[in-house]
Amino acid sequence: MPILLFLIDTSASMNQRSHLGTTYLDTAKGAVETFMKLRARDPASRGDRYMLVTFEEPPYAIKAGWKENHATFMNELKNLQAEGLTTLGQSLRTAFDLLNLNRLVTGIDNYGQGRNPFFLEPAIIITITDGSKLTTTSGVQDELHLPLNSPLPGSELTKEPFRWDQRLFALVLRLPGTMSVESEQLTGVPLDDSAITPMCEVTGGRSYSVCSPRMLNQCLESLVQKVQSGVVINFEKAGPDPPPAEEGQPDISRPFGSQPWHSCHKLIYVRPNPKTGVPIGHWPVPESFWPDQNSPTLPPRTSHPVVKFSCTDCEPMVIDKLPFDKYELEPSPLTQFILERKSPQTCWQVYVSNSAKYNELGHPFGYLKASTALTCVNLFVMPYNYPVLLPLLDDLFKVHKAKPTLKWRQSFESYLKTMPPYYLGPLKKAVRMMGAPNLIADSMEYGLSYSVISYLKKLSQQAKIESDRVIGSVGKKVVQETGIKVRSRSHGLSMAHRKGFQVLQGISEDVPHRLLDLNMKEYTGFQVALLNKDLKPQTFRNAYDIPRRNLLDHLTRMRSNLLKSTRKFLKGQDEDQVHSVPIAQMGNYQEYLKQVPSPLRELDPDQPRRLHTFGNPFKLDKKGMMIDEADEFVAGPQNKHKRPGEPSMQGIPKRRRCASPLLRGRRQSPAVNSHIGGKGPPAPMTQAQPGLIKPLPLHKEATNDSIVDDVVENHVADQLSSDMTPNAMDTEFLTSPPNLLEPSTNHTEALGHEHLGNNDLTVGGFLENHEEPRNKEQSAEENIPASSLNKGKKLMHCRSHEEVNTELKAQIMKEIRKPGRKYERIFTLLKHVQGSLQTRLIFLQNVIKEASRFKKRMLIEQLENFLDEIHRRANQINHINSN
């Protein structure tokens, strides 16, 4: 799981702009996002962990650490601001300490018991800076210095602040402020000459001098390829140079002196196991000291082990069933030199100085060997002093048949004395795998001394406490200073002791003599208060604080506040200013919703709710949806149990009058047509039809005025004319006879009754049912006075076809959603559809459409057959009438 730590320069110099118009900090943010996109192409990037550190003071510099997720990382990256100093050394130390936080707890470093390349936590630090001078509170620095004192326990066990699996890369932005006239050449990205370059090379990384956006993308692609699992090792040549590749031919081309391949500081790749995804190894790299059982502490180690190789050609040694570790070397001058020799059958042995008890160079623990195809160079890690051990083990199993003799045991014990004690554990596992489990006695001590073990345990506990403290401090904001500290002048005389001030004092008699005795030490704890930027000046308190061009505007505001006597507070902003919100705050609906009153309860909370089943394609659950409007967020929970097809009587606003222009000043024609058809004005109903499905009023105990208000549809009121006012409409309604209102107010029965008549819907009845309102109208006109007949028609038309059909549609939709194949009630309700033939056909088509949503095939088939029969009968009637 690679760790990718971005160290972003947030000094004030990052506010400079390139020729693209963007600041260096914006360029750095874009570079991080581009790197993440390029890295996401690799399937191995799923295990990446991203961290973010800035140039602020610790612990505020850590923006995203071990516990923060990807969303937090991106949010902190977006909110970075360039303000502060270029404290590169302190920030690098903070980054390294953050990476080393858990190493003592997990035991990755394995202090005193050899270095295990397969115990690693690969990390890459990518620093993005502008390469300016290093500035601190004490001044400007020319060289990069990392603080030596670290709060992390156990840091004294390693000489350097970094580890061998941590590499530092730097992107130094050198983008010019003006467009370059010269064309950019496609060459390699050069190293930068800033102070961070030597630090990068020490850790095994490098720096990039970025001079153009194209070069920046090239660097990011190179960095993505650098994300490899491995450790950095110093390879140094020990002894003379190797002889020429072909004997008898002198190597004329070889120059004298030190060569680049003599000392290389490169990475060895530690590949993870394809099955487990974790690297697997057997043998450590020896320590550079011989463990002393009497030593109370451990000597500090270098971050990168120094491995020396001998250029003497040797035969590679391998025996059956003895495990070994194989690591590929990163391309370097050393690998190039070995491959050019073209001798894959020979190898060079490797050593660690002072690893043996009496030998300064130590014994070999492996060898360097070119691959058979001469494509790479591999480091083979074997048991310590393997040229002695391997022949002994070979004789044990091939000659002695796993039954060691006394002479063999003496040779084996003498070998164990030359081997560091921490190799006993891996060696016991290896011989057990080979078939000799009792070869090494369990009583042999191969661990650390008691004092060292206690010391390491104590450091581990302290590191755990420090880790919890650092993790808990991540995300805390910098404490803002409440004022500016008053500091005494370090040089020069004070104002009161200057000669010019004394001359002025002699001229003027008003100057108090106390000024001569001023002592700045009395004001060491004083602070100058800062202005509150969020506090707006109350300019209406003083007319002279108002700019001249804003006098009329302020006068208008003050007049509006004065005239609004119902308000208990002064309103400092007008309506336009309330809606003048910065773009960055436009999407922040949470603060606005906190001030909105809670939504009203459901109209009928006792009504049973239909439970959603798993996999229901019609489920409208909006809990997980992102809402971009505050009003929708508030209004959403009220209607969450309604489908789009269901009418919501709760949201119908009240209307005062019927606004159909077709009803004004003219007698209704006998022909009956619906609003939907648009062919003519519909006839109002004055009496309820027998068996009519009556819509329920919203308020059962409301007055006549409120009943008419509730039942008027929204689209009716949109056609109001100026000659009909609400007061006039109310007067007309109140003066109308009571018997005119009874048919529309006595709607107390719901649509769920079963005594609605015959369930069979005939085509003839469907075609002729729309003529009934005219007969009802004629019978009603005989009993109603002529003075109020036109008024009643206007009112009852608003309560006629639209409301009845809406209620019928709601009931039919509920019946369609019910499981089963009992459709008699649907056809019964279809008998009572009001309006013209065209209105009824549209209504029937909507029912078929709703049935198709719920896959009611039998119902659809019956309704379509019924619809075809209607068209056929209608065509016959039209044909007869035309004849």
Swiss-Prot record:
Region (Disordered) location: 666-686
Leader sequence residues: none
Chain's gene name: Ints6
Keyword field: Chromosome, Nucleus, Phosphoprotein
Protein name: Integrator complex subunit 6
UniProt motif Inhibitory loop: location: 625-632
Gene3D superfamilies (alphabetical): von Willebrand factor, type A domain (3.40.50.410)
UniProt-listed GO biological process terms: protein localization to chromatin; RNA polymerase II transcription initiation surveillance; snRNA processing
Domain text: The inhibitory loop acts as a regulator of protein phosphatase 2A (PP2A) activity: Asp-628 and Glu-629 residues mimic phosphoserine and phosphothreonine residues and bind to the PP2A catalytic subunit PPP2CA active site to block substrate-binding.
Residues found modified as Phosphoserine: 800
Subcellular location(s) per record: Nucleus; Chromosome
